[in-house]
Amino acid sequence: LIYRLTHTNKVYFLSRPRRFGKSLLVSTLEAYFLGKKELFKGLAMESLEKEWNTYPVLHVDFSGSKYNSVDNLKAAINKQLLLWERVYGREEGDTTFSLRFESVIHRAYEQTGQQVVVLIDEYDSPMLDSNNDYETQKEIRNIMRDFFSPLKKSDPYLRFVFLTGISKFSQMSIFSELNNLQNISMRDDYSAICGITEQELRAQLQIDIEQMAQANNESYEEACVHLKQQYDGYHFSENCEDIYNPFSLFNAFAQKKYANFWFSTGTPTFLIDILQECDFDIRELDGTTATAEQFDAPSDRITDPLPVLYQSGYLTIKGYDPDFQIYTLTYPNKEVRKGFIESLMPAYVHLPARENTFYVVSFIKDLRVGKLDECLERLKSFFASIPNKLDNKK
């Protein structure tokens, strides 16, 4: 997949949930373009690539800071530009972010004789962090637009451009201006580029599964079933095979238990903000439908939680109707379903933690012993507490 990605087009965008391997993919691309052949020993890339050229790589990661103010974003961009300028130099007339970025690209090309590789990880973090403040987000959007603008003008100097994020902001100029940008987020041929497939799990992680089974007093196949129920089930295109959450899977192997690791890292605040602002019946989430156009977030304001819930990994594709081009969405696995009830739903409907714990624990206990009538009554009671419309002023 990496070889195909780097040899069939120049500019790509990939959307995946947090902690799903996007940064590892970016680091892999960086190692490849830096010519680090030794890191690919024994892999398909070692034999596929014949030249192993070294390119100048400009790698920026927007996930490392909080961008709830314009000053924070400006400081982060300035810091990154200074790091590049220490390597390639700076002209006195380079005063704006766009001029400085453009000059770095040009000088890197001139000094190395090779086209430049630009890797931008979590490009949308600044917009998502400022989603609850429209004026701040508007300023941040303009700064980001200015910063990204040299990528179009510098096309002859660029070998490869790769952007990752959670959401695709459809009206951001970077998506309309970049030459031949390919959005591979929902393409079948790249659906498994992040995450772990069933085949990879059984072929590469057999020892881990055996140790997991032994630690939990179960058979190998029972461990596989538990892992699949807990961490599998992600689909990123209509014909995508099942994908495991890599963060949860590797944490489960490390700790030898089936816990909710993905949710333990915290629910993104932007998602809670969006859920609290939107008029959306969360009882309809499991099995809801969406068109492909709905997966793009508008650049001015996110008002529909559905695409964000999908792109954030709380919902995944369950089915696809090619006649109407409609996707059916559902929770991917037990970890997400349980985590949603415990984490997102209380934030959405403002339930106190004590009351939330009571509902969840009682519901699970009744379900385990087969008290289906009691389960239904608890669900009715729980959903009755949810207002039909949220008060956005609260």
Each predicted region: which residue ranges?
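Phosphate-binding site recognition
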Residues: 1-394
